[in-house]
Amino acid sequence: MSPPHVPPARPAAAARYTGTAIVLHWLLALLIVGTFSLGVYMHELPFSPARLKYYSWHKWAGVSILALSFLRLAWRLTHRPPAAVAMPGWQAGAAHATHLLLYALFFTVPLVGWAYSSAAGFPIVWFGVLPLPDFVPVDKALAEMIKPWHERTAMLMAALVVLHIAGALKHQFIDRDGLINRMRPARG
């Protein structure tokens, strides 16, 4: 008598992040992709009322990213993430470095944008209601020095977001290790 067929073992279900961490992750993801896309789009527009409106929206979203980043960092520092999924050391190191750089850019990109806007003499009024203080004094020469740094750091963040998504998709479709479920919104 032959032994019964035993299906191959599936990887153990990965522990999930907290609901708050998941909500903050996806809110930031949507805001970052939307703000970056708007920045690329509005950059090429001729000077017009529409362009000014888009710049205001871009700045509102940037300040929102900054505020949510402070919340996300505070949550992350006070709530341990779930245990990591087993993976080769180089992948774990690459994932860790990518996350650290993303967190740094969550703060750097909006702060450099705020400094640029302040130096250029364009105040930020968050959602048209809350005027924010200038980050640096008005100085057109300084604004021209800061502007490319906002663009470069935004491009670096976009590249890291693409790398982050590629890594998640690799785990989902190649490794099939359930890693992506750790941050997937709960199904009702």
Task: Give short role names for the model-derived ranges.
Residues M1-G188:
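Membrane-embedded alpha-helical bundles that constitute the cytochrome b-like, heme-associated redox core
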